[in-house]
Regions:
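A cross-family detector of function-defining hotspots
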Residues: 33, 37-78, 94-100
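Active-site rim elements
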Residues: 23
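Short, exposed beta-strand-loop hairpins at the edges of beta-sheets
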Residues: 78-87
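Soluble non-cytosolic domains of exported or imported proteins
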Residues: 13, 17, 26-34
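Compositionally biased P/S/T/G-rich terminal and signal peptide-adjacent segments
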Residues: 1-18
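Membrane-helix boundary/juxtamembrane interface motif
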Residues: 11-14, 87-100
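Short amphipathic alpha-helical surface micro-motifs
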Residues: 8, 28-29, 40-42
Length: 100
């Protein structure tokens, strides 16, 4: 799994449910959190624990792009690993376009 591939396959056509399914297939519920985090890091994300909720690891991948062949923007994929004990209990993913 690579976020660049997920963006190519699903991002531009706004198929978030399909992207969520691809990430969920790579990170099954019950997987050890360190293993899930390692997969996301290899996929290109940067991960850190959320300060307010230490049972959640938030991983962010960003990619620079242009809009209308001129305007700079960042595509940002955020994946949150919700842990229960040392295992993945839930995964949430979102995509945002940050226009400059």
């Amino acid at each position: 799994m690579r976020f660049a591939d997920i963006e190519t396959a699903f991002g531009q056509t706004d198929q978030l449910p399909a992207a969520q399914a691809a990430v969920a297939a790579a990170l099954p519920i019950g997987m050890p959190l360190p293993d899930a985090q390692a997969i996301l890091v290899r996929a290109g994300a940067r991960c850190q624990l959320q300060r307010r909720n230490p049972e959640v690891i938030e991983c962010v991948y960003s990619q620079r792009t242009t809009i209308d062949d001129y305007y700079a923007a960042d595509i940002v994929w955020t994946t949150a690993l919700h842990g229960e004990g040392a295992r993945v209990a839930q995964i949430s993913i979102r995509r945002e376009l940050d226009k400059h």
